[in-house]
């Protein structure tokens, strides 16, 4: 069964459930998780393919399962970073290493599950190493990522912990930055997941 993406799938940050950590996915994958996977892919790929307006959806480059009502540990990302297509659907991801140095997207971050705009620098690790079961490769993989892809992986991983990007903005000085922090300036037409 294929799904036509709709914004009615989205769960917003005013829903208490999305602010709680998600549960691990059990293997073998059941029908409910397969449905979740198909919906996540349909939603983000519609954005990637430039069809967000056609489907009347909020465009995004990534989405976590709890953003569409599945309280499980998986997310999907599909974006271009430095003119390279990046695509992964990670199940039960774990961050196994990260830099001490920080980074932020110069333009800030957005989120499919956040209606209110939150201005400021979202401070994250400059690079991360994450592992998880990749749906497309059908095996556990390890990814070391920087740049937009690295920021997006951290953004989606935060969702699985019940955390939102705006919780990483300095509440006293939203534009605070240190000179050694890396500024990431992607050319991007859509928001984060």
From Swiss-Prot:
GO terms for biological process: co-translational protein modification; translation. It catalyses: N-terminal N-formyl-L-methionyl-[peptide] + H2O = N-terminal L-methionyl-[peptide] + formate. Disruption phenotype: Probably essential, it was not disrupted in a global transposon mutagenesis study. Keywords: Hydrolase, Iron, Metal-binding, Protein biosynthesis. Fe cation binds at residues 111, 155, 159. Binds 1 Fe(2+) ion. The active site is at 156. Its cofactor is Fe(2+). One of its GO terms (molecular function) is peptide deformylase activity. It comes from the Bacteria. It holds the Pfam family Pep_deformylase. Its EC number is 3.5.1.88. Belongs to the polypeptide deformylase family. Removes the formyl group from the N-terminal Met of newly synthesized proteins. Requires at least a dipeptide for an efficient rate of reaction. N-terminal L-methionine is a prerequisite for activity but the enzyme has broad specificity at other positions. PANTHER family: PEPTIDE DEFORMYLASE (PTHR10458:SF22). This is Peptide deformylase. It comes from Mycoplasma genitalium (strain ATCC 33530 / DSM 19775 / NCTC 10195 / G37).
